[in-house]
Amino acid sequence: TLGSMTAHVVYAKPSDGDPDADIAPPDVTHLGYVVQAAGVSVYVSGDPINTFAEHDSLVLPVADLEPDIGLLTNHPTEGEFPFFEGSVDMALGIGLTHVAPAHYQCFVTRNYDPAEWVACFPDEGPSPFVIPRNSHIVYPSGL
């Protein structure tokens, strides 16, 4: 049983836009969530801006909630989302313990191998893992 659960809403793109990325208000309502339940805190990134890790206004509110695990949207070549290195920078900046990729196996023409994402993480830092499509994990005992 989960007992009580709390969900915090955080921005995935700067709330005032990003002129360098040609993102103007109001096209900034992209959200992420930090969900806390049963002593575990999970960050679901939503569709973050490619330069998420460079925006303290995005990183710090998530980091302040001290999530344990992050489900991070990323892509190796599509500039809408953080590239693999940007995803690593997100995880490090937030202070995550474990990370899993999101949006792989979602789009036929934009698919990627999540093992390539995993390989980008340094030995010191968040531990990456892949949740196979249409499956699940039990955290933290499943890692």
Predicted feature residues:
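Loop/turn elements at helix/coil->beta-strand transitions in domains of secreted/extracellular proteins
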Residues: 5, 39-41, 66-70, 95-97, ...
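Short, solvent-exposed loop/turn segments at secondary-structure boundaries
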Residues: 19-23, 82, 111-112
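Generic structural signal for short, solvent-exposed loop/turn connectors between secondary structure elements
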Residues: 77-79, 85-86
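Core dinuclear metal-dependent hydrolase active-site scaffold
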Residues: 1-60, 64, 136-143
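Active-site neighborhood of phospho(di)ester-bond hydrolases with catalytic His/Asp-centered motifs
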Residues: 43-50, 69-76, 99-104, 130-133
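A short, flexible beta-alpha/helix-coil linker loop
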Residues: 14-15, 77, 105-106
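Binuclear metal-ion centers of metallo-dependent hydrolases, dominated by the metallo-beta-lactamase
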Residues: 1, 56, 61-63, 84-143
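Short, solvent-exposed loop/turn segments at secondary-structure junctions
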Residues: 52, 79-80, 108
